[in-house]
């Protein structure tokens, strides 16, 4: 966990807001309200000045005194929260090597830093060689490959044949890594952090159906989260929204029956909330099953109504 102290750079007299990172789902709207009171926290703009950042990631101190976007900062914190000890070194060393400072670059680095090799202990070359072999093979290797691998020789060849970069986090070899461009600076890539019932992508229905300009919403979500996702996609009217289903953890009986051509993100969110709050998780009791199926029928009827009206450009899921 991290903790960021954010302020309005234009009006420091407004005070500060302390935001936990990653933001717990049930605190998201409250955190947004704290920032709105300072006249910051825009859904798309980087308008939050970082006064301080308390985290286990020293390299992130470069964000202090810069302006960031709340959702980008939250997304980065979620990505880093899942990192292993090895990735901890890889990310920080590559940030320093590449002199990265923008949130876009930092987020993109989380998707590719695993390709780099960082040596923090030169006394165990066997382990260094083994780690390097895994890094350049996408983190995958069979037991037979690893048993036959000469870790010491692999490490020596790496050190002798390549120029490493000395950082505060170890000597890093990029192994030809190219900075990922998965994040375009507006549409955060789909990433499961918490257990969710379903993930829905939204885009303007004026976008091509195969458009990659998709903003992801993890249901159930608060009304504020849905509205901010719409703002990030430039959608002012829910009627102009196209929905895409990424995956689902709905109970099988609902997942199979549900017509995902629903055009109402709020009703789909209600369905996810009913399923998520069932006493036995995905094992729905009879009372809640009736509520789920009632929701399903309501959503399905609305989708059928659109078809009868000859609606051609509606949501596809």
Region annotations inferred by a language model:
Residues 150, 290-301, 306-317:
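Non-Sec secretion/translocation targeting segments of pathogen effectors
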Residues 94-128:
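Phosphate/anion-contacting hairpin/loop surfaces
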């Amino acid at each position: 966990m991290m903790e960021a102290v954010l302020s309005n750079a234009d009006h420091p007299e407004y005070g500060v807001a302390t935001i936990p990172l990653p933001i717990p789902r049930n605190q998201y709207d409250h955190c947004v309200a704290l920032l709105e009171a300072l006249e910051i926290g825009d859904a798309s703009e980087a308008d939050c000045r970082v006064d301080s950042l308390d985290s286990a990631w020293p390299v992130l101190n470069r964000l202090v005194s810069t302006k960031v976007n709340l959702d980008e900062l939250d997304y980065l914190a979620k990505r880093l929260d899942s990192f292993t000890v090895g990735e901890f070194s890889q990310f920080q060393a590559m940030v320093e090597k590449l002199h990265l400072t923008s949130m876009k670059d930092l987020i993109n680095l989380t998707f590719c830093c695993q390709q780099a090799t960082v040596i923090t202990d030169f006394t165990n070359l066997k382990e260094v060689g083994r780690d390097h072999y895994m890094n350049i093979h996408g983190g995958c290797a069979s037991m037979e490959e690893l048993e036959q691998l000469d870790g010491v020789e692999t490490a020596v060849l790496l050190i002798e044949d390549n120029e490493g970069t000395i950082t505060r986090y170890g000597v890093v070899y990029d192994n030809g890594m190219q900075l990922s461009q998965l994040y375009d600076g507006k549409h955060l890539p789909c990433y499961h952090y918490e257990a969710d019932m379903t993930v829905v992508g939204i885009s303007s229905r004026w976008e091509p159906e195969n458009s990659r300009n998709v903003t992801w919403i993890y249901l159930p979500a608060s009304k504020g989260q849905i509205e901010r996702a719409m703002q990030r996609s430039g959608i002012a009217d829910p009627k102009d929204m196209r929905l895409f289903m990424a995956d689902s953890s709905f109970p099988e009986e609902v997942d199979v029956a549900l017509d995902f051509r629903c055009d109402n993100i709020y009703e789909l969110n209600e369905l996810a909330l009913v399923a998520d709050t069932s006493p036995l998780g995905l094992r729905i009791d009879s009372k809640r099953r009736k509520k789920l199926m009632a929701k399903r029928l309501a959503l399905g009827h609305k989708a059928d109504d659109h078809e009868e009206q000859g609606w051609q450009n509606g949501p596809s899921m």
